[in-house]
Amino acid sequence: MKKVKAAIIGPGNIGTDLMYKLLRSNYIEIALMVGIYPQSEGLARARSLGIETSHEGIGAVLREPDIKIVFDATAAKPHLKHAPLLREAGKIAIDLTPAAVGPYMVPVVNIDEHLEADNVNMVTCGGQATVPIVAAINRVAGVRYAEIVASLASKSAGPGTRQNIDEFTETTARALEVVGGAGKGKAIIILNPAEPPIMMHNTIYTLVENPDEELIKSAVFEMVKRIQEYVPGYRLQVEPLVEGNKVTTIIEVTGAGDYLPPYAGNLDIMTSAAARAGELMAMRLLGVYKPERGDSCA
């Protein structure tokens, strides 16, 4: 089967975990992994798997006309520089940084709206874990306000996450509104230093217009099943608890352990969502994409 050639920029934890996921894809071929440090462990791993590598950064990607999709797993500032260069080169950018140059992408909610975009942003780990639940509740109950608390193992939060705490909360809150449909969104992140490290937990509070418990639970259960198609470790820890017009739901995410440890579910859900988005976009380029169940809850 023909595959779409793709590149990964950024051979760190996120980029390396993403690489392992994309190696299983039926529609994407990783043609290149690039970084800026010749001795990078991620580049060495890629080479050991037979993937071409370069330490010349984005320049190496721009020189390859056959590469159609580029996953940017660097940081917000580099992506702001990369985005216009990739656009000019006619390449699709899937942005795993907080830069948010393109529209927010939560595959299970709004893939069809942005399938032909040349740059999409994967929001945040908290966004990928919670926006679908808010969208599901909003569809049947009307969400006036959504507040999420993402608790992550401190060990899973590298320097990039720690430097981007403000961007995390702002981007996640905005995505709760723009993609999830909430009238107002708020996000809080907690880095938990407990040993052994905790799994990623997300508590989702919503205030709704129509607190129909049966409809809300049905919508959430269906959404969880759909997310599990690409994030097997995603599970409903506490099913929707309806108290008046307040609905509380708790989600746990366990990582697949492709490269990162299972407790790093926050990173795993980002790479899983990016791989899912990339694969669906590749299917469109190959002319084989067919919407399933109307991949939009908006």
UniProtKB/Swiss-Prot annotation:
One Pfam family it belongs to = AcetDehyd-dimer
Quick check: keyword NAD in the entry? yes
- Record has Oxidoreductase as a keyword: yes
Active site at C125 (acyl-thioester intermediate)
Q: Which domain of life is it from?
A: Bacteria
The UniProt GO MF terms for this protein read:
acetaldehyde dehydrogenase (acetylating) activity; NAD binding
What InterPro entries does the record tag this protein with? Acetaldehyde_dehydrogenase, Acetylaldehyde_DH_C, NAD(P)-bd_dom_sf, Semialdehyde_DH_NAD-bd
Which amino acid positions bind NAD(+), per UniProt? S156, A157, G158, P159, G160, T161, R162, Q163, N164, N266
Q: Which GO biological process annotations does it have? A: catabolic process
Top-level class of the enzyme under EC nomenclature: oxidoreductase
Record key words, sorted: Aromatic hydrocarbons catabolism, NAD, Oxidoreductase
- Assigned EC number: 1.2.1.10
Catalytic activity, per the record? acetaldehyde + NAD(+) + CoA = acetyl-CoA + NADH + H(+)
Protein family membership: Belongs to the acetaldehyde dehydrogenase family.
Q: What is this protein called?
A: Acetaldehyde dehydrogenase
What gene is this protein a product of? mhpF
